């Protein structure tokens, strides 16, 4: 009888613990889901539903080496915009200007978490603290 009670308690506790997830997982989900909504509102019109970009004007966000090698500059690009040609994939240039965005560091972090973990990218959570630090280093 005791064994059944203990086994039942262990099972219930296991289910509860498994359903909670870690603090990091929950933080990632909050940033990602918030970023998805912001992307749809502010970025999707140019970068596309699937991050495919637009011809030679708007660069794609799909598994872009640019995102991975310029992670520290992404907050600056989102915040300040970008003018002039940019080479993103395989030396291909894109000439469309990206406007500056009036977004808080936490909203920039949300968008970057979404973009850097969608469209074939898997780069983890970008926090508002990361963004605030990166914005101080904008050139």
Predicted regions and their residues:
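Electrostatic cytochrome c docking/interface patches
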Residues: 20-38
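Cys/His-rich metal-chelating microdomains
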Residues: 23, 49-50
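Residue-level signal for mature regions of secreted extracellular proteins and peptides
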Residues: 13, 36-39, 131
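Conserved helix-turn-beta segment immediately C-terminal to the redox Cys motif
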Residues: 65-70
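Sec-dependent bacterial lipoprotein signal peptides
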Residues: 1-20
């Amino acid at each position: 009888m005791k064994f059944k009670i203990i086994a039942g308690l262990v099972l219930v506790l296991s289910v509860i613990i498994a359903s909670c997830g870690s603090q990091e997982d929950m933080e990632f989900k909050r940033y990602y889901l918030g970023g998805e909504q912001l992307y749809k509102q502010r970025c999707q019109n140019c970068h596309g539903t699937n991050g495919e970009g637009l011809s030679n004007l708007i660069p794609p966000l799909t598994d872009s080496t640019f995102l991975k090698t310029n992670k520290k500059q992404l907050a600056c690009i989102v915040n300040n915009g970008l003018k002039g040609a940019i080479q993103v994939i395989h030396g291909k240039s894109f000439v469309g200007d990206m406007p500056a965005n009036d977004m808080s560091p936490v909203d920039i972090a949300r968008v970057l978490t979404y973009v850097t973990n969608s469209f074939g990218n898997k780069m983890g959570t970008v926090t508002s603290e990361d963004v605030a630090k990166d914005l101080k280093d904008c050139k």
